[in-house]
């Protein structure tokens, strides 16, 4: 690629292969103005205001939606590692009262994780990651060690 200076108040946008390999993706020319409308799903065309976002992570597939097991696998989550593999997994869920549920399991299929999150009372839940990146620490103690070094972690603190 070419070297390009980033102007003041400019941004660098990086698109992964999942995005650039789609049939509708067209690489924009350097300097092209773009408008981002962040949404939670492909069908969320109205988006939400970024000013209200303090932190955001991505994951998938969805496990529980509106208090029911979500059996639809979005594009990008149809490989065997999501459909049938049994492996270490990490999930986040939300209870009806807004409390957060964090789960780390040593061995589960996506279906087992869906059922577990529903049994725990989650009205919304998402799979974050699995395999070697599954880890969990609580109050400074490592409860589940990762299978490899991690470059990015989700950390939740109370104050």
For each predicted feature, which ranges?
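Gly/Ser/Thr/Pro-rich low-complexity, intrinsically disordered segments
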Residues: 1-159
